[in-house]
Amino acid sequence: MRHRKSGRKLNRNSSHRQAMFRNMAVSLLEHEAIKTTLPKAKELRRVAEPLITLAKEDSVANRRLAFDRTRSKEMVGKLFNELGPRYQERPGGYIRILKMGFRAGDNAPMAYVELVDRPELVDADEE
């Protein structure tokens, strides 16, 4: 029976799934927006949001936990210096998932995952 077993398998073994979500979380935090399939996007929320919550309180222990989960020194720096202070007043819900139709090749439902309250990029044409 499958009672109370949360999370999606996504046809991968556990180490592959863990590595995939670690990489996706780092990409999302680095670029602040990524495009992926809808089930992966919904599962990514469970990985990325706790990292931002962790970054709201800067301590050596929290930085080490974040490094353990991302394996990227640059991302730990960005989390604690930029993203943590940005979301200090927000009690969760740091990620927005927008549905964006279906992929051409296999008709998989696609989604655009972005951080809320991210700074808008200004085009050079508008200046």
UniProtKB/Swiss-Prot annotation:
Coiled coil: none annotated. Keywords: Ribonucleoprotein, Ribosomal protein. One of its GO terms (cellular component) is cytosolic large ribosomal subunit. It comes from the Bacteria. InterPro entries: Ribosomal_bL17 (IPR000456), Ribosomal_bL17_CS (IPR047859), Ribosomal_bL17_sf (IPR036373). Pfam families: Ribosomal_L17. GO terms for biological process: translation. GO terms for molecular function: structural constituent of ribosome. PANTHER family: LARGE RIBOSOMAL SUBUNIT PROTEIN BL17M (PTHR14413:SF16), RIBOSOMAL PROTEIN L17 (PTHR14413). NCBIfam families: L17. Belongs to the bacterial ribosomal protein bL17 family. Part of the 50S ribosomal subunit. Contacts protein L32. This is Large ribosomal subunit protein bL17. It comes from Alcanivorax borkumensis (strain ATCC 700651 / DSM 11573 / NCIMB 13689 / SK2). The gene is rplQ.
